[in-house]
Curated annotation (Swiss-Prot):
Gene name, Swiss-Prot/TrEMBL: miaB
First-tier enzyme category under EC: transferase
Annotated residues for binding of [4Fe-4S] cluster 2: C154, C158, C161
SUBUNIT field: Monomer.
Protein's recorded name: tRNA-2-methylthio-N(6)-dimethylallyladenosine synthase
GO MF annotations, alphabetized: 4 iron, 4 sulfur cluster binding; metal ion binding; N6-isopentenyladenosine methylthiotransferase activity
């Protein structure tokens, strides 16, 4: 290819965000620069999400807006990557022939061959058992905090989820590769790392499980904060809780998806735990780490969710009092077991239940944040927001707007002067 400009649009989770960083890293080694508009690009990449219908609709809408660019520039390459690409590869090409290439999550490395015109076909969706051993270059969006993949794929097969079909079976990265990557990040001045996986608790390389991996990362000089996402509740162990309590770099925050408060629904979801078992683990966490922030995911309107099942989810929110949640209406995904269940809930009922869940959680979050007024929080400064204010995050992952002008990467103590539903404000008291 002669042109060397790339535009990339990312949909979905942190794994996708990091996959986009890796694609940009590959292209960067070939002299590509990232541009902010598709019309300026020689390659347009859509890194897609298939977890919900809404994410797919956003992708198709964005894709439709670049179709005309092909007529103006026949050399333009349009690449669809990510989970929708994996699920619908051939179907997408047949339906939308102006797409040039389809790349699944296990095959990001083929972008190098594509730009060098060294490929003989257009669809790259084969499962790659070696994906955990391939260390790709990364062009990171941030200079303070970084994502680091530790495990790929998922073995849980929750009935509503396409991830095992789009990202394959679990494959853990070699521990030495992870430590080497994080050590390099520390040398480059990064202060925080987030360990990524569909289920980080399943990490296993030889004798190193996830708690032992955290211990190794803790020892890397220069890294000040460690986070991880996502944890499956069934695999949350007391060993992990003890490590979180004992090691000061591990932030006091965990994202632990509940999904529903009804045992009937949890069983239909194939979550492999009961609400009582989940709540016991919440108690472990809060007993060991009293100030821990716990966030979660909730799905409303799952097939066969009766009013009493939904009420159990409402009661769970009241009992647990999460710091925040991501809540969604159930979205049937083609090929999943849940899509084939009887008793699907109407869109009207799902919408009403979602509103009720979000309203309740907003009240809980607002009250919890209010308690932080006048308290001192350690904040890692991340940069400026759209209004020009200095912003950062607490160890509990709460966004803080800081009145003073401090450079990114500094860790400061902030006295919280004002709280909002989704953010805090305050003044620096020491650096």
């Amino acid at each position: 290819m002669k042109g060397r400009a790339v535009y990339i649009k990312t949909f979905g989770c942190q794994m996708n965000e990091h996959d986009s960083e890796r694609m940009l890293g590959i292209l960067g080694t070939k002299g590509f620069i990232e541009v902010d508009e598709p019309k300026k690009a020689d390659i347009v990449i859509f890194n897609t999400c298939a977890i919900r219908h809404k994410a797919e609709q956003k992708f198709f809408s964005s894709l439709g807006r670049v179709k005309h660019l092909k007529k103006k520039n026949p050399q333009l390459k349009i690449i669809v990557a990510g989970c929708s690409a994996q699920l619908q590869g051939e179907k997408l090409l047949n339906k939308l022939p102006y797409i040039d290439y389809i790349i699944g999550p296990d095959n990001l490395h083929v972008i190098e061959n594509i730009i060098e015109n060294q490929v003989s076909h257009r669809i790259f969706t084969d499962e790659n058992p070696e994906v955990a051993n391939i260390n790709l270059p990364v062009k990171r969006k941030d200079c303070v905090k970084a994502w680091v993949n530790i495990i790929y794929g998922c073995n849980n097969y929750c009935t509503y989820c396409v991830v095992p079909y789009t990202r394959g079976k679990e494959r853990s990265r070699p521990v030495d590769d992870i430590i080497k990557e994080i050590s390099l990040l520390a040398e480059q001045g990064y202060k925080e790392v987030t360990l990524l996986g569909q289920n980080v608790n399943s990490y296993k390389d030889g004798n190193t499980n996830f708690p032992l991996l955290l211990e190794k990362v803790e020892k890397i000089e220069g890294i000040k904060r460690i986070r991880f996402i996502t944890s499956h509740p069934k695999d949350l162990s007391k060993e992990l809780v003890d490590v979180m309590k004992d090691y000061k770099k591990i932030c006091e925050h965990i994202h632990l998806p509940l999904q529903a408060g009804s045992n009937k629904i949890l069983k239909l979801m194939n979550r492999k735990y009961t609400y009582e078992e989940y709540f016991e683990k919440i108690c472990w966490l809060r007993e060991a780490i009293p100030d821990i922030a716990i966030t979660s995911d909730i799905i409303v309107g799952f097939p066969q969710e009766q009013h009493e099942d939904f009420e159990k989810t409402i009661n769970a929110l009241k009992e647990i009092r999460f710091d925040g949640i991501f809540a969604f209406k159930f979205s049937p995904r083609l090929g999943t077991a849940a899509a084939k269940l009887d008793g699907h809930i109407s869109e009207e009922v799902k919408a009403a239940r979602l509103i009720e869940v979000l309203k309740l959680q907003d009240e809980i979050t607002e009250r919890k944040n209010k308690r932080l007024e006048g308290k001192i929080q350690e904040v890692l400064v991340e940069g400026k927001d759209e209004e020009g204010f200095t912003t950062g995050k607490t160890r509990t992952n709460k966004v803080v707007k800081i009145y003073s002008d401090i450079k990114a990467g500094e860790i400061v103590n902030v006295k919280i002067a004002k709280t909002h539903r989704h953010s805090l404000e305050g003044d620096i008291i020491s650096t």
